[in-house]
Protein backbone atom coordinates (compact mmCIF):
# COMPACT_ATOMS: atom_id res chain seq x y z
CA UNK A 1 0.00 0.00 0.00
CA UNK A 2 1.45 3.43 -0.92
CA UNK A 3 2.57 5.66 1.95
CA UNK A 4 0.34 8.66 2.55
CA UNK A 5 1.93 11.99 1.61
CA UNK A 6 0.99 13.87 4.77
CA UNK A 7 2.36 17.20 3.57
CA UNK A 8 0.21 16.96 0.45
CA UNK A 9 -2.76 15.98 2.61
CA UNK A 10 -2.26 19.06 4.78
CA UNK A 11 -1.96 21.35 1.77
CA UNK A 12 -5.04 19.76 0.21
CA UNK A 13 -7.15 20.20 3.34
CA UNK A 14 -6.16 23.85 3.49
CA UNK A 15 -6.85 24.46 -0.20
CA UNK A 16 -10.18 22.67 0.09
CA UNK A 17 -11.53 24.92 2.84
CA UNK A 18 -10.21 27.98 1.03
CA UNK A 19 -12.07 26.91 -2.12
CA UNK A 20 -15.22 26.22 -0.12
CA UNK A 21 -14.96 29.60 1.57
CA UNK A 22 -14.89 31.37 -1.77
CA UNK A 23 -17.86 29.39 -3.05
CA UNK A 24 -19.97 30.18 0.02
CA UNK A 25 -19.00 33.85 0.25
CA UNK A 26 -20.33 34.33 -3.29
CA UNK A 27 -23.82 33.68 -1.86
CA UNK A 28 -23.47 35.22 1.61
CA UNK A 29 -26.14 37.79 2.51
CA UNK A 30 -27.68 37.50 -0.95
CA UNK A 31 -31.01 35.98 -0.03
CA UNK A 32 -30.37 32.35 -0.99
CA UNK A 33 -33.29 29.94 -1.09
CA UNK A 34 -33.38 27.49 1.80
CA UNK A 35 -34.46 23.90 1.19
CA UNK A 36 -35.09 21.27 3.85
CA UNK A 37 -33.43 17.87 3.76
CA UNK A 38 -35.31 14.73 4.90
CA UNK A 39 -33.99 15.25 8.44
CA UNK A 40 -35.46 18.79 8.41
CA UNK A 41 -32.05 20.49 8.44
CA UNK A 42 -31.52 23.36 5.99
CA UNK A 43 -29.43 23.28 2.82
CA UNK A 44 -28.68 26.00 0.26
CA UNK A 45 -26.86 26.44 -3.01
CA UNK A 46 -23.91 27.65 -0.90
CA UNK A 47 -23.69 24.26 0.84
CA UNK A 48 -23.85 22.39 -2.45
CA UNK A 49 -21.34 24.56 -4.29
CA UNK A 50 -18.97 24.53 -1.32
CA UNK A 51 -19.01 20.73 -1.24
CA UNK A 52 -18.42 20.59 -5.00
CA UNK A 53 -15.43 22.91 -4.57
CA UNK A 54 -13.98 20.71 -1.82
CA UNK A 55 -14.46 17.53 -3.84
CA UNK A 56 -12.72 19.07 -6.84
CA UNK A 57 -9.65 19.94 -4.75
CA UNK A 58 -9.54 16.55 -3.03
CA UNK A 59 -9.98 14.55 -6.22
CA UNK A 60 -7.26 16.52 -7.99
CA UNK A 61 -4.75 15.58 -5.28
CA UNK A 62 -6.02 12.15 -4.20
CA UNK A 63 -8.26 10.68 -6.91
CA UNK A 64 -8.35 7.23 -5.30
CA UNK A 65 -9.47 8.35 -1.83
CA UNK A 66 -12.97 7.79 -0.47
CA UNK A 67 -15.10 10.76 0.59
CA UNK A 68 -17.97 11.18 3.04
CA UNK A 69 -19.76 14.47 2.39
CA UNK A 70 -22.67 15.91 4.33
CA UNK A 71 -24.52 16.86 1.16
CA UNK A 72 -23.48 14.17 -1.35
CA UNK A 73 -22.97 11.17 0.92
CA UNK A 74 -20.37 8.44 0.55
CA UNK A 75 -18.07 8.18 -2.46
CA UNK A 76 -16.13 4.92 -2.73
CA UNK A 77 -12.36 4.88 -2.91
CA UNK A 78 -9.23 3.44 -1.36
CA UNK A 79 -10.14 1.61 1.83
CA UNK A 80 -7.31 3.12 3.91
CA UNK A 81 -8.12 6.80 3.29
CA UNK A 82 -11.35 8.78 3.56
CA UNK A 83 -12.03 12.51 3.46
CA UNK A 84 -14.84 13.72 5.73
CA UNK A 85 -16.50 16.94 4.60
CA UNK A 86 -18.89 19.49 6.08
CA UNK A 87 -19.05 22.16 3.38
CA UNK A 88 -20.81 24.76 5.52
CA UNK A 89 -21.06 24.27 9.25
CA UNK A 90 -23.65 26.73 10.50
CA UNK A 91 -26.09 26.85 7.59
CA UNK A 92 -28.88 28.32 9.71
CA UNK A 93 -26.68 31.22 10.76
CA UNK A 94 -25.47 31.65 7.18
CA UNK A 95 -29.04 32.07 5.96
CA UNK A 96 -29.66 34.76 8.60
CA UNK A 97 -26.56 36.73 7.64
CA UNK A 98 -24.55 35.73 10.71
CA UNK A 99 -20.77 35.52 10.32
CA UNK A 100 -19.86 32.45 12.41
CA UNK A 101 -19.99 29.66 9.82
CA UNK A 102 -17.48 27.79 7.70
CA UNK A 103 -16.26 24.57 6.07
CA UNK A 104 -14.68 21.59 7.83
CA UNK A 105 -12.46 19.04 6.04
CA UNK A 106 -10.56 16.06 7.49
CA UNK A 107 -8.54 13.14 6.15
CA UNK A 108 -8.99 9.86 7.97
CA UNK A 109 -6.22 7.34 7.23
CA UNK A 110 -6.38 3.78 8.57
CA UNK A 111 -9.09 4.83 11.03
CA UNK A 112 -7.37 7.95 12.41
CA UNK A 113 -7.82 11.56 11.35
CA UNK A 114 -4.31 12.66 10.40
CA UNK A 115 -4.94 16.03 8.73
CA UNK A 116 -7.68 18.61 8.78
CA UNK A 117 -8.68 22.18 8.20
CA UNK A 118 -11.54 24.56 8.87
CA UNK A 119 -12.25 28.19 8.09
CA UNK A 120 -14.22 31.20 9.27
CA UNK A 121 -14.55 32.87 5.85
CA UNK A 122 -16.05 36.18 6.95
CA UNK A 123 -13.13 36.69 9.33
CA UNK A 124 -10.64 35.55 6.69
CA UNK A 125 -9.30 32.83 9.00
CA UNK A 126 -8.10 29.35 7.97
CA UNK A 127 -7.05 26.77 10.57
CA UNK A 128 -5.07 23.71 9.46
CA UNK A 129 -3.07 20.87 11.03
CA UNK A 130 -1.55 17.47 10.37
CA UNK A 131 -0.18 14.88 12.74
CA UNK A 132 3.34 15.93 13.72
CA UNK A 133 3.19 19.13 11.64
CA UNK A 134 1.63 21.43 14.22
CA UNK A 135 -1.55 23.50 14.03
CA UNK A 136 -1.62 26.79 12.18
CA UNK A 137 -3.79 29.85 11.65
CA UNK A 138 -3.65 31.77 8.39
CA UNK A 139 -5.40 35.11 8.04
CA UNK A 140 -6.01 37.43 5.13
CA UNK A 141 -3.49 39.90 6.58
CA UNK A 142 -0.68 37.71 7.95
CA UNK A 143 1.46 34.67 7.24
CA UNK A 144 0.52 31.39 8.99
CA UNK A 145 1.22 31.43 12.73
CA UNK A 146 1.33 28.46 15.12
CA UNK A 147 -1.72 27.81 17.27
CA UNK A 148 -1.47 27.14 21.00
CA UNK A 149 -4.16 26.55 23.59
CA UNK A 150 -4.33 28.57 26.79
CA UNK A 151 -2.47 27.77 29.99
CA UNK A 152 -5.35 28.62 32.35
CA UNK A 153 -5.29 25.92 35.08
CA UNK A 154 -8.29 26.80 37.28
CA UNK A 155 -11.95 26.44 36.36
CA UNK A 156 -12.92 29.61 38.21
CA UNK A 157 -10.70 31.53 35.77
CA UNK A 158 -11.87 29.69 32.65
CA UNK A 159 -14.10 30.61 29.74
CA UNK A 160 -16.57 27.91 28.68
CA UNK A 161 -17.95 27.75 25.16
CA UNK A 162 -21.17 25.81 24.54
CA UNK A 163 -22.36 24.23 21.33
CA UNK A 164 -25.99 23.53 20.42
CA UNK A 165 -28.12 25.11 23.19
CA UNK A 166 -31.27 23.17 22.28
CA UNK A 167 -29.37 20.04 23.33
CA UNK A 168 -27.04 21.28 26.07
CA UNK A 169 -29.61 23.42 27.88
CA UNK A 170 -32.21 20.64 27.92
CA UNK A 171 -32.31 17.45 30.01
CA UNK A 172 -30.18 15.51 30.71
CA UNK A 173 -27.38 17.99 29.98
CA UNK A 174 -28.92 21.11 31.52
CA UNK A 175 -28.08 20.48 35.18
CA UNK A 176 -24.37 19.58 34.84
CA UNK A 177 -23.82 22.23 32.16
CA UNK A 178 -25.40 24.87 34.40
CA UNK A 179 -23.11 23.88 37.27
CA UNK A 180 -20.07 24.21 35.03
CA UNK A 181 -21.27 27.50 33.56
CA UNK A 182 -21.93 29.15 36.91
CA UNK A 183 -18.60 28.04 38.40
CA UNK A 184 -16.31 29.42 35.67
CA UNK A 185 -15.35 33.01 34.89
CA UNK A 186 -17.66 33.33 31.91
CA UNK A 187 -19.73 31.27 29.49
CA UNK A 188 -20.40 31.98 25.83
CA UNK A 189 -22.32 30.22 23.06
CA UNK A 190 -20.85 31.31 19.74
CA UNK A 191 -22.20 28.28 17.90
CA UNK A 192 -20.91 25.74 15.41
CA UNK A 193 -17.15 25.75 14.69
CA UNK A 194 -16.65 29.26 16.11
CA UNK A 195 -16.88 28.08 19.72
CA UNK A 196 -14.25 25.45 19.05
CA UNK A 197 -12.03 28.07 17.41
CA UNK A 198 -11.99 29.98 20.69
CA UNK A 199 -10.38 27.01 22.45
CA UNK A 200 -8.01 26.38 19.56
CA UNK A 201 -6.73 29.97 19.70
CA UNK A 202 -6.40 30.12 23.49
CA UNK A 203 -9.37 32.45 23.98
CA UNK A 204 -11.44 29.85 25.85
CA UNK A 205 -10.58 26.79 27.91
CA UNK A 206 -13.36 24.33 27.03
CA UNK A 207 -16.04 23.72 24.41
CA UNK A 208 -18.87 21.23 24.85
CA UNK A 209 -20.95 19.97 21.93
CA UNK A 210 -23.58 17.24 21.57
CA UNK A 211 -26.17 15.99 19.11
CA UNK A 212 -23.99 16.38 16.00
CA UNK A 213 -22.56 14.25 13.16
CA UNK A 214 -19.03 13.08 12.44
CA UNK A 215 -18.53 15.76 9.74
CA UNK A 216 -19.30 18.47 12.33
CA UNK A 217 -16.26 17.39 14.37
CA UNK A 218 -13.92 15.51 12.02
CA UNK A 219 -10.89 17.87 11.79
CA UNK A 220 -11.09 19.14 15.35
CA UNK A 221 -9.20 16.39 17.17
CA UNK A 222 -6.01 16.70 15.11
CA UNK A 223 -6.25 20.50 15.14
CA UNK A 224 -6.56 20.68 18.90
CA UNK A 225 -4.01 18.01 19.76
CA UNK A 226 -1.44 19.65 17.51
CA UNK A 227 -2.14 22.92 19.35
CA UNK A 228 -1.46 21.26 22.71
CA UNK A 229 -5.05 20.61 23.77
CA UNK A 230 -7.19 17.54 24.33
CA UNK A 231 -10.23 16.28 22.42
CA UNK A 232 -12.54 13.45 23.49
CA UNK A 233 -16.19 12.56 23.50
CA UNK A 234 -18.12 13.22 26.71
CA UNK A 235 -17.20 9.76 28.00
CA UNK A 236 -13.50 10.56 27.65
CA UNK A 237 -12.89 8.49 24.50
CA UNK A 238 -10.54 10.19 22.00
CA UNK A 239 -12.83 10.05 18.96
CA UNK A 240 -14.73 12.34 16.59
CA UNK A 241 -17.39 9.73 15.83
CA UNK A 242 -19.58 9.73 18.96
CA UNK A 243 -21.78 12.72 18.13
CA UNK A 244 -20.62 14.72 21.13
CA UNK A 245 -17.33 16.14 22.33
CA UNK A 246 -15.30 18.03 24.86
CA UNK A 247 -12.47 20.15 23.48
CA UNK A 248 -10.19 21.76 26.06
CA UNK A 249 -6.79 23.19 26.83
CA UNK A 250 -6.00 19.84 28.44
CA UNK A 251 -5.43 21.23 31.91
CA UNK A 252 -9.16 21.37 32.69
CA UNK A 253 -10.33 18.38 30.67
CA UNK A 254 -10.72 15.91 33.53
CA UNK A 255 -12.58 18.48 35.62
CA UNK A 256 -15.20 18.95 32.90
CA UNK A 257 -15.44 15.22 32.17
CA UNK A 258 -16.12 14.54 35.84
CA UNK A 259 -18.90 17.12 35.89
CA UNK A 260 -20.48 15.57 32.79
CA UNK A 261 -20.09 11.95 33.91
CA UNK A 262 -23.79 11.53 34.84
CA UNK A 263 -24.85 12.20 31.22
CA UNK A 264 -21.89 10.66 29.40
CA UNK A 265 -22.87 6.98 29.58
CA UNK A 266 -23.90 5.27 26.36
CA UNK A 267 -26.35 2.43 25.70
Stretches found by the model and what they are:
Residues 48, 52, 71, 87-90, ...:
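Generic detector of well-ordered alpha-helical packing
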Residues 108-112, 122, 131-134, 140-141, ...:
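Short loop segments at secondary-structure junctions
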Residues 1-88, 252-258, 265-267:
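N-terminal subdomain of lithium-sensitive/metallo-dependent phosphomonoesterases centered on the IMPase/IPPase/PAP
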Residues 77-136:
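DPxDG-like acidic metal-binding loop motif
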Residues 33-35, 59, 74-76, 118, ...:
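Short secondary-structure boundary/capping segments
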Residues 148-267:
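An extended, acidic
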Amino acid sequence: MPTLDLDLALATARRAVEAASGAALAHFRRGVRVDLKPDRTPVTIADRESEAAILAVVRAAFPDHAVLGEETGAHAGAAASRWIVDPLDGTRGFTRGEALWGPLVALEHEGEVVAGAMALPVAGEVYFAARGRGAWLSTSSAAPAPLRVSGVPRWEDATLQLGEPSVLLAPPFAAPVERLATACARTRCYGDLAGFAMVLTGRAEAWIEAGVKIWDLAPMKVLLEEAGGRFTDLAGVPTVASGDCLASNGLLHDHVLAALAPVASRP
